[in-house]
């Protein structure tokens, strides 16, 4: 037997044949007939016009679809760019809006608390309806602004006394400073003393010159501001200390918030003075001629250089002294000084022409146009405080009084904003560009350097 028959068995062995499979093969119908194999294939004939129309429609539909896709893409890109731009704009002012919202919530807390207390007495349904009305009545949030009315400075001015013609030795030595402070402390507790109108000898920064105590030799007086702890002592000391001598100099004492009235009938104008004339010489000269009747002497000086402008105002206690002093017109003060004084009665300021911008009517119009928007939002009490600040306070405080303060702690400042504490920071329009200082030494160095460079290139000159 072969290996094949040993594994699978012989073909004649009917015992190993499966009957179900054998029955399937017995029931077969034989081979496929010839007529089914030779039958022609069915083909559908499409007319030429219909085919071209369908192909054209397909092409037009595809073109329209591509154009629509392009338009859709362009619109989507535009929307995307707009969204990014809006997000940028929102994010730039996000921090300031947050802080402004906090300020607004703090301002609205007080009236809301009072309203809630009133609503508690009513029914619950009423409170729900009120809440709905509050939500519906909300307006767009505005930028929080606080108007600077200089209330702290005004309160400080009520306790401040101006002292003129003070001996400059008060700044130089501590014993003199203590003596000056003791003169005013007998009327009440002193909070602080500020010295102004100091003339220095060297052209260095004022803080450095003050630390070195290098004062100008020809200007031996200065002004001071004495701040008391309370208001009453400041009012008491003015009439008692005015025209008193301190270290051989007559003091001119006046209150900052409540100055003494200026009476033109008791005042004279003194002209043709030396630019370096001192107040003390005028005090002594007119006191000797009017039996110590001088109330105050004021030499008009330049704000920057602190040098006199050549004229002064002298106020007396009595009008009879004015007539006595008028007899001294066209006469020198002493034999050493040959300048003849020009003495006349003090007059009120003459009104400028109606065509001048300094006329009262024109200045009122300009002031009203600038301040109308701001003053419309202020109450009567706030306007009173603002007007008081502009008449009483100094030059720097007057410039900032009434302006809105937008920059607060934690808020981002924009370019060009003036910020308190940063000296010399102005807007881009007013900011000056610093130019380098050109000196003879630097120009000589540059010329020598250029000549050496040219010699190296071209050789020495023959």
Curated annotation (Swiss-Prot):
PROSITE patterns: RRM. SMART domains: RRM. Signal peptide: none annotated. Residues 159-258, 266-348 form the RRM domain. It comes from Debaryomyces hansenii (strain ATCC 36239 / CBS 767 / BCRC 21394 / JCM 1990 / NBRC 0083 / IGC 2968) (Yeast). It is found in: Nucleus, Nucleolus. The keyword Repeat applies. The keyword rRNA processing applies. GO terms for biological process: maturation of LSU-rRNA from tricistronic rRNA transcript (SSU-rRNA, 5.8S rRNA, LSU-rRNA). Involved in pre-25S rRNA processing. Residues 51-68, 127-136 have a biased composition (Acidic residues). GO terms for molecular function: rRNA binding. GO terms for cellular component: nucleolus; preribosome. It comes from the Eukaryota. Residues 365-377 have a biased composition (Low complexity). It holds the Pfam family RRM_1. Its main location: nucleus. Residues 337-350, 429-438 have a biased composition (Basic residues). This is Nucleolar protein 12. Belongs to the RRM RBM34 family. Residues 27-147, 331-462 are annotated as: Disordered. Keywords: Nucleus, Repeat, Ribosome biogenesis, RNA-binding, rRNA processing. Residues 69-79, 87-120, 137-147, 439-452 have a biased composition (Basic and acidic residues).
């Amino acid at each position: 037997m072969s290996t094949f028959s040993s594994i699978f068995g012989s073909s004649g062995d009917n015992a190993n044949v499966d009957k179900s499979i054998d029955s399937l093969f017995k029931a077969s119908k034989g081979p496929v007939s010839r007529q089914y194999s030779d039958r022609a294939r069915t083909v559908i004939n499409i007319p030429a016009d219909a085919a071209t129309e369908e192909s054209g429609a397909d092409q037009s539909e595809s073109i329209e679809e591509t154009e629509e896709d392009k338009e859709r893409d362009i619109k989507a890109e535009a929307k995307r760019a707009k969204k990014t731009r809006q997000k940028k704009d929102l994010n730039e002012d996000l921090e300031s809006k947050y802080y402004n919202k906090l300020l607004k919530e703090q301002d609205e807390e007080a009236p809301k608390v009072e309203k809630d207390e009133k609503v508690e007495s009513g029914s619950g349904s009423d409170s729900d309806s009120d809440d709905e009305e509050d939500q519906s009545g909300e307006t767009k949030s505005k930028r929080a602004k606080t108007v600077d009315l200089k209330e702290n400075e005004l309160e400080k001015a009520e306790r401040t006394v101006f002292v003129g013609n003070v001996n400059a030795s008060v700044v130089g030595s501590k014993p003199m400073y203590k003596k000056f402070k003791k003169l005013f402390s007998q009327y009440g507790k002193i909070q602080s003393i500020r010295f102004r109108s100091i003339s220095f000898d060297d052209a260095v920064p004022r803080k450095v010159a003050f630390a070195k105590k290098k004062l100008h030799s020809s200007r031996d007086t200065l002004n001071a501001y004495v701040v008391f702890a309370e208001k009453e002592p400041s009012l008491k000391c003015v009439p008692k200390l005015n025209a008193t001598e301190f270290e051989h100099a007559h003091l001119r004492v006046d209150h900052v918030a409540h100055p003494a009235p200026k009476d033109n009938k008791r005042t004279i104008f003194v002209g043709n003075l030396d630019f370096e004339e001192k107040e003390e010489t005028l005090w002594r000269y007119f006191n000797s001629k009017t039996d110590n009747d001088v109330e105050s002497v004021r030499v008009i000086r330049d704000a920057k250089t602190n040098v006199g402008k050549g004229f002064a105002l002298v106020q007396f206690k009595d009008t009879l002294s004015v007539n006595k002093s008028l007899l001294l017109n066209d006469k020198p003060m002493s034999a050493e000084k040959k300048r003849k004084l020009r003495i006349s009665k003090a007059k009120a300021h003459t009104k400028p022409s109606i065509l001048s911008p300094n006329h009262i009517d024109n200045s009122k119009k300009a002031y009203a146009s600038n301040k109308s928007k701001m003053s419309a939002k202020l109450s009567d009490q706030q306007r009173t405080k603002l007007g008081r600040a502009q008449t009483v306070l100094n030059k720097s405080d007057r410039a900032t009084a009434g302006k809105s303060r937008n920059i607060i702690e934690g808020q981002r400042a924009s370019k060009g904003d003036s910020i308190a504490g940063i000296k010399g920071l102005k807007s881009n329009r007013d900011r000056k560009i610093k130019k380098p200082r050109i000196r003879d030494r630097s120009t000589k160095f540059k010329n020598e350097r250029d000549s050496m460079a040219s010699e190296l290139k071209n050789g020495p000159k023959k």
